[in-house]
Amino acid sequence: MDKEKLFAQIKGGLIVSCQALETEPLYTKEGGVMPLMAKAAAMSGAVGIRANTVRDITQIKQVVDLPVIGIIKKDYPGTPMYITVTMKEVDELVACGVDILAVQGTGALRPDGSTSAQFIRAIKAKYPDQLVMADCDNFENAMACAEAGADFVGTTMRGYTPETQGINDIDFEFVHKLATECPAKVIAEGHIHYPEQAVKALEAGAFALVVGGAITRPAEITARFTGAINAAKK
């Protein structure tokens, strides 16, 4: 898809994350479940899909005509990085035709000792036309990734790193600061549980937003309800 056309398509819209890890109820070895989630999202007005693994991305692209943010989650020894960590995953994602390639953009080092900024520069050198999103946790890392060539920075990892531990809600001030000062387009992602929060994130300056657990993870949604009910009984 043409870059400017993609920007126009997702601006101000909802991208739905359709993922199921092996430990989750909706995971199957054969796949086929996440494409159904993606179809439901597309029917309801989603402007894009975020997906994990080449299999799910390929299956999703067969059933919906929406831009896909692609990632590969994989743990590596010696690093907390797990979202598109090495060039091997990058090569696989580019080969399956992801519209936006997302990588972890936090402060930890990759297995080869490279920083997030160095990794993004390497991706852009190898695939200069590939749109890249950095999943960040704080302002400094987001700026470093943007300056390295990331087209998008996401708030994806805020609250999930040692430096941001304890942040359990969408940080609208952080979104606004990035939208005001960062040269990359800002995608609000993480801790968005309600439609009102999504609207507020866009009002804070987000270019677009990603919502996953509140839409496509039934176990998480159920736990939110049962947790509230059980708390009220005490």
PLM regions with names:
Residues 19-21, 43, 72-77, 96-110, ...:
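Glycine-rich phosphate-binding active-site loops on the catalytic face of alpha/beta enzymes
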Residues 14-18, 49, 68-71, 101-103, ...:
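Hydrophobic faces of well-ordered beta-strands that scaffold small-molecule active sites
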Residues 64-72, 120, 127-128, 202-213:
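Short, electropositive alpha-helical surface patch
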Residues 28-29, 50-69, 80-87, 105-123, ...:
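Active-site-adjacent beta->alpha loops and helix N-cap segments on the catalytic face
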